């Protein structure tokens, strides 16, 4: 049986199945929901079988049929191979665009202050940063490589540990102009605690409650204080003297070195169970452009 050209229809089907929504698939593919629905219906007509169970009400309106679910891994693998083939064509030249996904805070506090050295080594390569807290689909969003913070396991991606992390209290030097202030951890009971909520939903993400609990500080109320969902903004609030932040060492490194922040109680160690990982799709390790950035990340992190 001759295979007709149905790549757009297959892409619409795969995205609709992943999102369980024509509207969400349309947003990803930059077309209208009606166009996605038409592409899926054309594929169903050609196959002679429905690909989705459609509901008129409820939270999920679109569920792939059993046959469609069985076919999806092969279809996704096929798109991955096509994407990799295009990447190999790009490698005919050292130029092009490398798309890198990182969190907004990691971009601001670690990557951007250091990336000039990568541009100096690879002047013909442009880097496009996709800053996002959510877990993006590398294939659908055309992501080449990224740095993720977490336990080190993400389906469909190679993950190589880049950096471990420690957490500790920090504050502005101006808070310590009163020499009697913040002499012991118990003194935190009289300070505004700045909370990092950027990964609050992850049970292993270090929090003030975990840090205070480890020390058994009964008088420190960890439910109060300033709550911010961006690690860079957490540090900026501390720099501005708004209170004491529980800083992530990778994010706070430059601010500590520049004297904008001071680490409190350095004798207390609290290692995060999470770490930073370089992530990319399997099979991409042979792409020189991508591996150049990967190697630069590891060389820079080791300094």
Where on the chain are the PLM-derived regions?
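Short helix-boundary/capping micro-motifs
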Residues: 15-30
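Helix-turn-helix DNA-binding elements, focusing on the entry/boundary residues of the two helices
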Residues: 21-22, 40, 54, 234
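Residues within the DNA-recognition helix of helix-turn-helix
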Residues: 32-35, 39-42, 114
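A short LG(V/I)-centered, amphipathic sequence patch enriched
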Residues: 44-64, 261
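Short helix-loop hinge/linker segments at domain boundaries
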Residues: 55-62, 69, 79-101
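Central regulatory/effector-binding core of bacterial HTH transcription factors
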Residues: 95-158
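C-terminal regulatory
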Residues: 140, 154-271, 302-303
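A late-sequence structural motif
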Residues: 266-303
